[in-house]
């Protein structure tokens, strides 16, 4: 019934098995990949023909994690998987980015790749094996795809590169880098690092590419026995149309791209495009030689040619800069004084307002992943409204691009954040992109660094980011610093680098062509370093290090530690005690399992009141100390005073006042606030208190004069 084929190799010390022919046989391509004991199913389906009028390649990648893969049941009311998590969205992008450039130009059939995590061994991250499985499914499908690709994760532990480290090894690694590519070239890099130098990062990319070569060989071996017949696809030849268009539009298009201001340049380009359409699609012609989609596609290709030729020939760019110059930068902090920290970062026509908010442990994000529930104390959210590019558009929940850009900036900043023990705050940063003309994610990195320093968060060092581009034709190439939006769309590489003056903290690279050599990547990294250092210098004009104190409106957090066996007493039955403390003091209180207590409030008085209350519950009263208390009961022989949390003690009638007392109620009544001194404990462990040795007005001890009896004892010497 089944015609199965499989290959198995040893990869980084674990078995990798690729199998096809048994599961999902109605898909164009399907591969079940097993790495260690992590199992993923990748399927691909592509429509037999493009939709009418389709003018782009509609590729969708869906990565999904099933909770049964880790032996769990989903939370929530419905108890089933819902909308994609942030991690699922990020891995979907991770798979999409290296495979998208390998579909031929002109292929516009609706194509969907679905990768499902079926089993997770909690040792091997499923993202890399999902990339491998998707590549294998595409290679077997017969769909026009210039693969296969391989992918690998690289760690850097004790000065050594590690291929596909286990999940528990990543805690020791100063690098988390995922690289994907073909046998000849790198296509995608995504990484987070702890201030590593450029040569170490480049070495990791090369190490990773070498590391996934056995995987590509295995996919090719499987394809030799299991691949479907390739689909026929003959891209249309538009060279004649392009030459004709070049003849009538080249000069005007070149002049349009000499305009440095974005809006004016776009208007000039649109005018040329309208003229071209009018020429090739004159009104009244029923069956024109070319469709509007063909003319638009060829015109876009012509734009790219003119921009690229100009850069390679003149070393001058669209906005007049040379290859290495960064656009003018203006940095401001304290833009929104009632927020905890804020910054405005403007680089050319790209601008971000970034706001930092400090919270408590209650504000931490709970993340439910296949590896278990964990709490995240740093969140970074990136918003890209349509007005930032002068357009109208959809508003609502963030899209994949916004989630991906936010995570890139998050990776860049996180290594510089203080440890929770040093700075026990939850941090949320929001980047509002208000203008965009290239590299808004790197503007977010810079703005986040500024806003956190403005908020008083003790960053180890400021962080800046820069986007690099590449134009390559045959042996000629130009590496561009701080690319514009057009240079991103029309170029061959988008290479984002973020870090401090000492090293790289985050790197993301997407390459659209083959042939990017180690030499070119090295040039780009070193050129990016110069740009990054320049940007850090410009940022320092606004603020160069974190403020010494938090903003006026930020909450204060005081940390105290209590014995673990006292946690129950502080919380109380059903949370009664801690609720009372919160209600009466106004402070927020978070108690962790190890006895760490975080008390938060914008008022120092509220924090101190809560701290004293908790201290009174967990601490033992000390003999000789003076405490404030409340009379809770009176009797003929004295008064009972609640003086130390829930602890009561007796003030004998002889200790109520220095003079003789006939009746307890002559001195105190229930509810009275009094000062008492702990004199000691009787033979049964009962507390003995005294009021007469304490000045009831000031709470200070009364010093007995010479010859007077002290504390009810013998006369002092």
Curated annotation (Swiss-Prot):
One GO cellular component term: cytosol
CDD domains assigned to the protein according to its UniProt record, in alphabetical order: KH-I_PNPase, RNase_PH_PNPase_1, RNase_PH_PNPase_2, S1_PNPase
Subcellular location: Cytoplasm
Disulfide bridge partners, by residue number: none
Keywords assigned: Cytoplasm, Magnesium, Metal-binding, Nucleotidyltransferase, RNA-binding, Transferase
Cross-referenced InterPro entries: ExoRNase_PH_dom1, ExoRNase_PH_dom2, ExoRNase_PH_dom2_sf, KH_dom, KH_dom_type_1, KH_dom_type_1_sf, NA-bd_OB-fold, PNPase
Cofactor(s) needed: Mg(2+)
Annotated ranges, domain S1 motif: 624-692
Catalytic reactions of this protein: RNA(n+1) + phosphate = RNA(n) + a ribonucleoside 5'-diphosphate
Domain KH: 555-614
EC numbers on record: 2.7.7.8
PROSITE patterns hit by this protein: KH_TYPE_1 (PS50084), S1 (PS50126)
Residues the record lists as binding Mg(2+): 488, 494
UniProt-listed GO biological process terms: mRNA catabolic process; RNA processing
Molecular function GO terms recorded: 3'-5'-RNA exonuclease activity; magnesium ion binding; polyribonucleotide nucleotidyltransferase activity; RNA binding
Record-linked HAMAP family: PNPase (MF_01595)
UniProt record similarity statement: Belongs to the polyribonucleotide nucleotidyltransferase family.
Physiological role: Involved in mRNA degradation. Catalyzes the phosphorolysis of single-stranded polyribonucleotides processively in the 3'- to 5'-direction.
Protein name (database record): Polyribonucleotide nucleotidyltransferase
């Amino acid at each position: 019934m089944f015609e199965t084929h499989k290959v198995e190799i040893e990869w980084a010390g674990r078995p990798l098995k690729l199998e096809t022919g048994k599961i999902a046989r109605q898909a164009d391509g399907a591969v079940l990949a097993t790495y260690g004991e992590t199992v993923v199913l990748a399927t691909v389906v592509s429509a037999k023909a493009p939709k009418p009028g389709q003018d782009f390649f509609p590729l969708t990648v869906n990565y999904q994690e099933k909770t049964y893969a880790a032996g769990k049941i989903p939370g929530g009311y419905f108890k089933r998987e819902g909308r994609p998590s942030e991690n699922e969205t990020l891995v979907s992008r991770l798979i999409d980015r290296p495979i998208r450039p390998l579909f031929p130009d002109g292929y516009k059939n609706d194509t969907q790749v679905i990768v499902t995590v079926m089993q997770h061994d909690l040792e091997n991250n499923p993202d890399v094996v999902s990339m491998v499985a998707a590549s294998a499914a595409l290679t077997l499908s017969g769909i026009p795809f210039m693969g296969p690709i391989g992918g690998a994760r690289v760690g850097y532990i004790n000065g050594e590169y590690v291929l596909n480290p286990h999940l528990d090894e990543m805690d020791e690694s100063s690098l988390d880098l995922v690289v994907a590519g073909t046998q000849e070239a790198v296509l995608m890099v995504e990484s987070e690092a702890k201030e590593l130098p450029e040569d170490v990062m480049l070495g990791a990319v090369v190490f990773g590419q070498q590391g996934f070569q056995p995987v590509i060989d295995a996919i090719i071996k499987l394809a030799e026995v299991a691949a479907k017949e390739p689909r026929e696809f003959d891209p249309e030849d538009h060279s004649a149309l392009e030459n004709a268009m070049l003849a009538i539009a080249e000069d005007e298009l070149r002049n349009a791209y000499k305009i440095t201001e974005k809006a004016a340049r776009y208007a000039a380009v649109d005018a040329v495009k309208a003229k071209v359409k009018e020429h090739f699609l004159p009104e009244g012609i029923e069956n024109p030689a070319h469709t509007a989609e063909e003319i638009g596609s060829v015109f876009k290709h012509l734009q790219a040619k003119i921009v690229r030729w100009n850069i390679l020939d003149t070393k001058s760019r669209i906005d007049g800069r040379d290859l290495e110059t960064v656009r003018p930068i203006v940095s401001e902090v304290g833009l929104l004084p009632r927020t905890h920290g804020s910054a405005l970062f403007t680089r050319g026509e790209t601008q971000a307002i970034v706001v930092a908010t400090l919270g408590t442990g209650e504000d931490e994000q709970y993340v439910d992943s296949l590896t278990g529930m964990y709490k995240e104390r740093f969140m970074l959210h990136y918003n890209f409204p349509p007005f930032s590019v002068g357009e109208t558009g959809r508003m609502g929940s963030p899209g994949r691009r916004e989630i991906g850009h936010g995570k890139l900036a998050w990776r860049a900043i996180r290594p510089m954040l203080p440890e929770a023990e040093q700075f026990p705050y939850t941090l949320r940063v929001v980047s509002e992109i208000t203008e965009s003309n290239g590299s808004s994610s790197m503007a977010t990195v810079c703005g986040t660094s500024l806003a956190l320093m403005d908020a008083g968060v003790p960053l180890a060092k400021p962080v800046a980011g820069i986007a690099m581009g590449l134009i390559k034709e045959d042996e000629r190439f130009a590496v561009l610093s701080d690319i514009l939006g057009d240079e991103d769309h029309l170029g061959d590489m988008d290479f984002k680098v973020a870090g401090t003056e000492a090293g790289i903290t985050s790197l993301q690279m997407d390459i659209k062509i083959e042939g990017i050599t180690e030499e070119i990547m090295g040039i780009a990294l070193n050129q990016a370093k110069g740009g990054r250092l320049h940007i850090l210098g410009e940022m320092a004009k606004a603020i160069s290090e974190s403020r010494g104190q938090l903003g006026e409106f930020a909450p204060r957090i005081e940390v105290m530690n209590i014995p673990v066996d006292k946690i129950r007493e502080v919380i109380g039955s059903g949370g009664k005690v801690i609720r009372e403390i919160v209600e009466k003091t106004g402070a927020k209180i978070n108690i962790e399992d190890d006895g760490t207590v975080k008390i938060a409030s914008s008022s120092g008085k509220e924090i101190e009141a809560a701290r004293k209350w908790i201290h009174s519950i967990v601490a033992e009263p000390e003999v000789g100390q003076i405490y404030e208390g409340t009379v809770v009961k009176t009797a003929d022989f004295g008064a009972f005073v609640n003086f130390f949390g829930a602890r009561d003690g007796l003030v004998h009638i002889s200790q109520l006042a220095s003079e003789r007392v006939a009746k307890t109620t002559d001195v105190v009544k229930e509810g009275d606030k009094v000062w008492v001194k702990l004199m000691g404990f009787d033979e049964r462990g009962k507390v003995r208190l005294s009021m007469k040795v304490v000045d009831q007005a000031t709470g200070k001890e009364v010093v007995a004069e010479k010859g007077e009896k002290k504390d009810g004892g013998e006369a002092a010497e």
